[in-house]
Structures are given as C-alpha cells and as structure tokens.
Amino acid sequence: GFGSGKTEVSVNLTKYLAGIDPIPPAIVDLDLVNPYFRSREAEAEMEAMGIKVIVPRGGNFFADLPILLPEVKGAVESGAGRVILDVGGDSQGARALGSLSDVFPPDGYDMLMVLNSRRPFTGDLAGCCKVMSRIEATAKMRFTGLIANSHMIEETDPEVLWEGYHLAREVGREMNLPLAFLSAKREVLEQMDTTGLNCPILPLTRSMLKPWEKKTGPTGL
C-alpha cells in the first residue's frame, strides 16, 4: 500500500496463521482509506483458505459500521480462532477501534503498530511516539508491540529495511514495547544479509494490487 503497508501485513499474517493455527483466523476490514482488500479476488482467495472475511458490504463505511460491529464482536467473543483487525492509522480508524475496546479483555489482545520509516509523521522517534500516543488515546487501547515494515513501494532495498528495523528498536526502547517481527517483500529479503537482525521475519507476497496493475485478457491468465 501507499502508507505503512499494514493491509499487506494484515493479509499476509492472516494467511500465515491460517497455515499453522488449528482453527483458521478471521480478518476484519476496519480501514476506511484503503478499499483494495475489499476486492472480490482478495476475499475469495482468503475464504478458500478457510479464513472468515468480515468487511463492510455497502458503499458507505460509516453507515455500515453499526452493522459491522456486532459481527466483529461476535467473532472476538466466540473465542474460535484468532481475529485480525486491519485498522486505519488515522483518527477515524482509531475511533472505529475504540468502539470495540470493551470487547477485548485487558490482557487478551495484541495491538501492533506497523511502522514505515519512509512515511511522514513516522520517520523518527518523536513522530512515531506522537502518532502512537494519539491512537492509544482515541482507541482507548494500548499498543503491545511493533512491526518494522519500512518500504518505498518498488524502490525498497535492504538499506530501507535496516533503517526501519533500527527505528522500530528505538521506538521499542522508548515505549517499552517488543518488536514482534520485521516484514518485507520476499524478493527484497532475499537480497538482505540478516546477520544481526534479532527478530522474526514475515515475508510478504503482494496481494493488494491496485486496479491499474491488474492484467486483463488472455495475457493475464
């Protein structure tokens, strides 16, 4: 994506968990800005893996939210498998998450901040801490960890990944949060010497193609 890349991370993490968890997870689209994950192709692919996909069905996110929230609450409260929420990092996303805050037991959830050091507002320690504190206040929930996901779309290289890793470590020390994992496109990770990288790695397979990137006709089959 054009922002932190959290939708790609959410989808790839959900697919990974579907392969290792005894009960496939559910994924919830609470991102108001990025509609790509609502595409029929992405939804069909995840459902074929046994993943429950919970998305707004109408054209207006805010009108759909009151209908969506009971379904999300039901998935969380059922205790049947993990539930991954893809939440926008803006004020609307934080408010949507805040409307669910009473569903999560205080120690029964992980809230992970996806950090991209190449984005405005999260390019340095002060910016990251400010953004995260604002989200926590609005969402009425606390972050429990960080994901290093620095990228520049197609221009990402190992240097960008290391930059993001070091920033995430710095933020983690300041806010007393662990680094859950580093995520990056598989082809960039293959170029990277990971010696000294002290965290798990989630390779990303890009699934959120923009409409203009999708091939059509016989050559795209």
Named regions from a protein language model:
Residues 3:
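Walker A (P-loop) phosphate-binding loop of P-loop NTPases
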